[in-house]
Amino acid sequence: MITNAISKIIKYDFKNTQLLNEALTHPSVLSKDNNNFNYERLEFLGDAVLNLVVSEMLFNIFPYDTEGNLAKKKTALVCGTKLVEIAQSINLGIFIIMSDGERSCGGANNSNNLENALEALIGAIYLDGGLKAAKDFIFLFWKNSATHMKVPPQDAKTILQEWAQSKGFPAPSYHIINKSGPDHNPCFTVEVRINSHETLHATGHNKKLAEQKAASLMLAKINYKIK
């Protein structure tokens, strides 16, 4: 069974397997009973839990780091590139439930799908087992990278721009293609384009965050690994 297979990989057994199913369900799957039965809500929660746990982890690992250095390290550990890297390491794509159309278009290997499903999985673990369970999962897959961070890494946009310059390409361009939600909680969709590479989209609660996430996805697309 899928539940048993993924539980062995993530070292966590769900008490409520419905939460796991929801975390692994892509929005392309339409439910007759609940149109919201997909990973989007859990992704929202998981993103917040991941940021909290990684922040505390870095705070304890690096007691003498400045706020600025801690922030840079956290950015590298929660960026799209790192999420995709971890999702691929546990073969998360093969467990994502999606429509035949989405799968035939490479949905199981799509960076955005992997990133979203991993955050949703964290959210599901948090709801099922509490903060302790979520921390155990995050420590299992993130602590090694956090511990071996020697120099504060650059943000994804800076890394992408330097990569483009090293290839003789023009600087990446970012454009807001959609803004939705209420004024107090907006959601921006940003498109990034670089040379001949396809455009990629990412969303965030502000323009800066959406651009960083788009840059992270592009780095994952070109197989650039943040050390």
From Swiss-Prot:
Its EC number is 3.1.26.3. InterPro entries: dsRBD_dom, RNase_III, RNase_III_dom, RNase_III_sf. It is found in: Cytoplasm. GO terms for cellular component: cytoplasm. GO terms for biological process: mRNA processing; regulation of gene expression; rRNA processing; tRNA processing. Its cofactor is Mg(2+). Keywords: Cytoplasm, Endonuclease, Hydrolase, Magnesium, Metal-binding, mRNA processing, Nuclease, RNA-binding, rRNA processing, rRNA-binding, tRNA processing. It catalyses: Endonucleolytic cleavage to 5'-phosphomonoester. It is an enzyme of class 3 (hydrolase). PROSITE patterns: DS_RBD, RNASE_3_1, RNASE_3_2. CDD domains: DSRM_RNAse_III_family, RIBOc. Residues 155-224 form the DRBM domain. Mg(2+) binds at residues 43, 116, 119. Its main location: cytoplasm. Residues 3-130 form the RNase III domain. The keyword Disulfide bond does not apply. NCBIfam families: RNaseIII. PANTHER family: RIBONUCLEASE 3 (PTHR11207:SF0), RIBONUCLEASE III (PTHR11207). Homodimer. Belongs to the ribonuclease III family. This is Ribonuclease 3. The gene is rnc.
